[in-house]
């Protein structure tokens, strides 16, 4: 549907969702979250199981989602959660110089990845348009309305972690995350 640039227009629309938090974001504006894996989105758009895919431009391009769903509306968000996890005991066994290499390379990789998200998104949008797709930006004013309607997901996560006995660690992560995303 071409009418996807307002929160009001998304009300009642079936939007591809996943996990515990994204459905809360969709419910907050009256949309209907539908769990669909990325590899099933093409067919879900084709059959009308979903109205919108809620995937980044790179995935829209690589999965050719502009074929069953000509209109791409966004970007409302990008998920950037790629990481390498090392257990505390293993980390403690590594020599300090190796730990420093890991930390240095992690910082470099993070910056390169975030820079790539910007350039990669632009390239994908250009390619979607060349293939006949239409990319419509979701206005900042509408995104602000969506954010205002959405519950504080980070607080919800921290509260859940506190119930599991990790309150101080969760508070530290939440504080760092809020500072990083300002």
Where is each model-derived feature located?
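N-terminal secretory/targeting leader peptides
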Residues: 1-182
